[in-house]
């Protein structure tokens, strides 16, 4: 049976998701919300969506599934708005936020007495590119699509979401919202801090050592690629997971101090072990491409 899907947020993630849904469910009607007229026009012209609006509340009552692919603060605000709308009985509401605890807690509170099935989600895919113009049907190919079930999630909710998103060709997995935030603080959020910090440090250093800009090559490029990511999104992510991220920063500072002391003392064995352990751990770790 054909369904009506409402994707709020037609940036890279939302627009790519629309393409993936269309691939396996061409009969589904996809509605799209975005404040930007340009993004709405691109999504319509490329057939990602069937109808578009800049009034979020207008399409919500029509949808069987609502997916919020928005910054975290806006996702939380829209969850609160949805709680006051006359939605379809048994509607599924999900999101694509990079942190989950605050979003899931808000949904559980707002929809506690509603016939809403909410499941948090985080597709672990992305790019330094942004906007509907950069949408790619293969963006989620073989990437982890993490579900963080709530007290409002039923077994059939997850089954329906997996079917809806089958065209993304992602790898679906479930994890507790708080554990999700702990894990992603280390392997996603903190690396962005490192990349941006290294970029800022190098730019400052290059003011007196001009050749630093010219000599930057492969290793520097690889380590700083994600420093091109959208600042607003990452500000929102860090502030929504601040305690866990501060723990990661403090832990890393202590590790930097250790290797700094080893270099200062000329401790060849400790320095060699530092690099060798990292090399072995990197080789043993399953790092998704």
Q: Residue spans of the language-model regions?
A:
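Conserved short alpha-helix immediately C-terminal to the canonical SAM/SAH-binding motif I
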Residues: 38-39, 74, 100-103
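Interdomain hinge/lid region at the active-site interface
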Residues: 209-278
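Residues at the starts of beta-strands that form the adenosine-phosphate
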Residues: 4, 29, 117, 144, ...
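Rossmann-like NAD(P)-binding element
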Residues: 57-87, 91-92, 98
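Rossmann-like NAD(P)(H) cofactor-binding subdomain of soluble oxidoreductases
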Residues: 80-133
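Internal alpha-helical scaffold of NAD(P)-dependent oxidoreductase catalytic cores
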Residues: 139-224
């Amino acid at each position: 049976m054909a369904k009506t899907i409402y994707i709020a947020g037609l940036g890279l993630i939302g627009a790519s998701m629309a393409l993936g849904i269309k691939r396996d469910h061409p009969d589904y009607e996809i509605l799209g919300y975005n404040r930007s007229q340009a993004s709405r026009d691109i999504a319509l012209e490329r057939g990602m969506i069937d109808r578009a609006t800049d009034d979020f509340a207008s399409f919500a009552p029509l949808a069987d599934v609502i997916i919020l692919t928005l910054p975290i603060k806006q996702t939380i605000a829209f969850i609160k708005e949805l709680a006051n709308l006359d939605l379809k009985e048994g509607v599924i509401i999900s999101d694509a936020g990079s942190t989950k605890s605050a979003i899931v807690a808000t949904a559980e509170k707002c929809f506690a007495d509603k016939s809403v099935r909410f499941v948090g989600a985080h597709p672990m895919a992305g790019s330094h590119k942004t906007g509907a113009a950069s949408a790619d049907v293969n963006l989620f190919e073989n990437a982890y699509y993490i579900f963080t079930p709530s007290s409002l999630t039923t077994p059939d909710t997850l089954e329906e979401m997996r079917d809806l998103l089958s065209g993304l060709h992602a790898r679906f997995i479930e994890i507790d919202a708080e554990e999700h935030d702990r894990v992603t603080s280390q392997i996603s959020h903190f690396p962005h801090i490192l990349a941006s910090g290294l970029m800022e440090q190098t730019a400052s250093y290059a003011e007196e050592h001009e050749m630093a800009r010219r000599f930057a090559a492969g290793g520097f490029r690889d380590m700083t690629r994600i420093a091109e990511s959208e600042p607003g999104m990452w500000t929102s992510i860090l502030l929504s997971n601040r305690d866990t991220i501060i723990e990661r920063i403090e832990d890393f500072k202590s590790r930097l101090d250790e290797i700094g002391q080893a270099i200062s003392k000329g401790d060849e064995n400790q320095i060699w072990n530092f690099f060798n352990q990292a090399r072995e751990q990197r080789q043993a770790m399953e790092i998704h491409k």
